[in-house]
């Protein structure tokens, strides 16, 4: 085949035109040490704190320690396939999770990947897990109630939208049950719920999902699960991921309730991670920044100003104490960060007082601002009467000859305690709570035997639904008890009481 010189030159010119020189510049590093879910990488000089790094075999890690000659990285997957000398690439991204309506009703892991077998999550929206909390100007004071449906809480330790209320107590005192009841009570309201399980057993998470499905609460709930068998970095990320999902709704003007169950296990996961990264240990071997770990998470709960859409993110963190020791490191930290705490006691739980709330040391620093007027009016004396009852009950053990006034106070206290008991998965609407607390504080139940109080309560609320539904509707509509409504309520209580007593005779 003969080619003329001019043909050769035209072919070469054509080839030169088509030639594309693609240069891809990537900041890469080399693994110098790996083990226990931690990798040390040489290179990556421009790496950011918290940046996502890509290892071979699609394993990702998160940069934590930026040192002079290496980067300490925690792995978000198995380290079994990673070897010394492997190339690590920067992604230029901070860890993100999917957000939006598509997540409702789903169970996801700490990276927002579905783990419920219902297929992929169809959303294009992503948010960084670490965000700066809203500033002072962006916020508004907490003033709307978030009804938990639990009489002891809504009456004495009210929670407002945008508040951070700690649930604290020993193991097996009903902390999770309290949180789940609060989620169930948000049905038919405009509140979206997120339950973050940190270091829990898989069976526990499955049981919670089952309970929420039975109550019809899963349709407005997201479960973020990082179970006990998962890597410490994933347990560390889970609450921030859940918070990012909640912030997406909050910034669209919606109301969100998020439960962190529990932050004790979160701190333990962070301690394990920090010690493996060779960070110096402090009190109880926790790293020095364990306060910041929780404060930067809980500060993201807020009630936004009207200019920012008026949305809210209410946080209910849970802390597990050891033998009721509230003065340990993590409990004191979280108590000082939150706007109040609900303290659950083993003694009360074992005595059959459930929910086992101790009103003496439980407090809501938002207080009456988070209550409707009607509840404020009827429940004002409740805490005082209970405190007097506890004091007198202690003295009454030593002597039997008590004066009439003391006997009356003891009798009233017993009835209040009985009224505040409530079965699990049975939250009560606020108007029914108000009617029942009104009947108790106005001493209509003094001549009803303590063992009959629960029957009286269920019968009375049925009677109000059937015979006087307008009383409840009026309380809900106005948020207060008018003189007319109060007169109707008094009449209804007396009428039902006669009927109840007649049935018992």
Curated annotation (Swiss-Prot):
Transmembrane spans: none
Any one GO molecular-function label of the UniProt entry: proton-transporting ATP synthase activity, rotational mechanism
Subcellular location: Cell membrane
Highest taxon in the source lineage: Bacteria
InterPro entries, per database record: ATP_synth_asu-like_sf, ATP_synth_asu_C, ATP_synth_asu_C_sf, ATP_synth_F1_a_nt-bd_dom, ATP_synth_F1_asu, ATPase_a/bsu_AS, ATPase_F1/V1/A1_a/bsu_N, ATPase_F1/V1/A1_a/bsu_N_sf
Stored SUPFAM superfamilies: C-terminal domain of alpha and beta subunits of F1 ATP synthase (SSF47917), N-terminal domain of alpha and beta subunits of F1 ATP synthase (SSF50615), P-loop containing nucleoside triphosphate hydrolases (SSF52540)
GO CC, any one term: plasma membrane
Catalyzed reactions: ATP + H2O + 4 H(+)(in) = ADP + phosphate + 5 H(+)(out)
Keywords tagged on the record: ATP synthesis, ATP-binding, Cell membrane, CF(1), Hydrogen ion transport, Ion transport, Membrane, Nucleotide-binding, Translocase, Transport
Binding of ATP, residues: 169-176
Keyword check for Cell membrane: yes
PANTHER family given in the database record: ATP SYNTHASE SUBUNIT ALPHA, MITOCHONDRIAL
Family: Belongs to the ATPase alpha/beta chains family.
Subunit structure: F-type ATPases have 2 components, CF(1) - the catalytic core - and CF(0) - the membrane proton channel. CF(1) has five subunits: alpha(3), beta(3), gamma(1), delta(1), epsilon(1). CF(0) has three main subunits: a(1), b(2) and c(9-12). The alpha and beta chains form an alternating ring which encloses part of the gamma chain. CF(1) is attached to CF(0) by a central stalk formed by the gamma and epsilon chains, while a peripheral stalk is formed by the delta and b chains.
Function statement: Produces ATP from ADP in the presence of a proton gradient across the membrane. The alpha chain is a regulatory subunit.
Designated name of the protein: ATP synthase subunit alpha
């Amino acid at each position: 085949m003969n080619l003329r010189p001019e043909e050769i030159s035209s072919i070469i010119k054509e080839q030169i035109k088509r030639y594309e020189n693609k240069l891809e510049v990537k900041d890469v590093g080399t693994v110098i040490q790996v083990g226990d879910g931690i990798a040390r990488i040489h290179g990556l000089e421009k790496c950011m704190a918290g940046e996502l790094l890509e290892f071979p075999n699609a394993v990702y890690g998160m940069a934590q320690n930026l040192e002079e000659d290496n980067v300490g990285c925690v792995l978000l997957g198995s380290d079994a396939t990673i070897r010394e000398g492997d190339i690590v690439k920067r992604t230029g991204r901070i860890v993100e999770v999917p957000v939006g309506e598509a997540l409702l009703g789903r169970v996801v892991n700490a990276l927002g990947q579905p783990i419920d077998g219902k297929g992929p999550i169809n959303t294009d929206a992503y948010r960084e897990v670490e965000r700066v909390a809203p500033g002072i100007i962006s916020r508004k004071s907490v003033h709307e109630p978030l009804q938990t449906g639990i009489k002891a809480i809504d009456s004495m330790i009210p929670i407002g939208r945008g508040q951070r209320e700690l649930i604290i107590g020993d193991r097996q005192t009903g902390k999770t049950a309290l949180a789940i009841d609060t989620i169930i009570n948000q049905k038919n309201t405009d509140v979206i719920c997120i339950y973050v399980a940190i270091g829990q057993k898989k069976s526990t998470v499955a049981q919670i999902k089952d309970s929420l499905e039975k109550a019809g609460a899963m349709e407005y709930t997201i479960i973020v699960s990082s179970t006990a068998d998962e890597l410490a970095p994933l347990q560390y990320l889970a609450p921030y991921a859940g918070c990012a999902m909640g912030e997406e709704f909050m910034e669209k003007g919606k109301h969100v309730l998020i439960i962190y169950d529990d932050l004790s296990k979160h701190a333990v996961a962070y301690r394990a991670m920090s010690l493996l990264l060779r960070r110096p240990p402090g009190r109880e071997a926790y790293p020095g920044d364990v306060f910041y770990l929780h404060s930067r998470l809980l500060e993201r709960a807020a009630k936004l100003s009207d200019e920012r859409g008026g949305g809210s993110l209410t946080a209910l963190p849970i802390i597990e104490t050891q033998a009721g020791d509230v003065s340990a490191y993590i409990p004191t930290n979280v108590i000082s960060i939150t706007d109040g705490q609900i303290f659950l006691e083993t003694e009360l739980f074992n005595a059959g007082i459930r929910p086992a709330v101790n009103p003496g040391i439980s407090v809501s620093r938002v207080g009456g601002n988070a209550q409707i007027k009607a509840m404020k009016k009827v429940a004002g004396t409740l805490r005082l009467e209970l405190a007097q009852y506890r004091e007198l009950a202690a003295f009454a053990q030593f002597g039997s000859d008590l004066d009439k006034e003391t006997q009356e106070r003891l009798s009233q206290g017993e009835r209040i305690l009985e009224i505040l008991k409530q079965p699990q998965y049975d939250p009560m609407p606020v108007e029914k709570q108000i009617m029942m607390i009104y009947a108790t504080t106005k001493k209509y139940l003094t001549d009803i035997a303590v063992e009959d109080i629960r029957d009286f309560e269920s019968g009375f609320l049925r009677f109000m639904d059937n015979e006087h539904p307008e009383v409840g509707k009026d309380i809900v509509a106005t948020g207060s008890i008018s003189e007319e409504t109060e007169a109707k309520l008094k009449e209804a209580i007396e009428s039902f009481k006669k009927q109840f007593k007649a049935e018992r005779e």
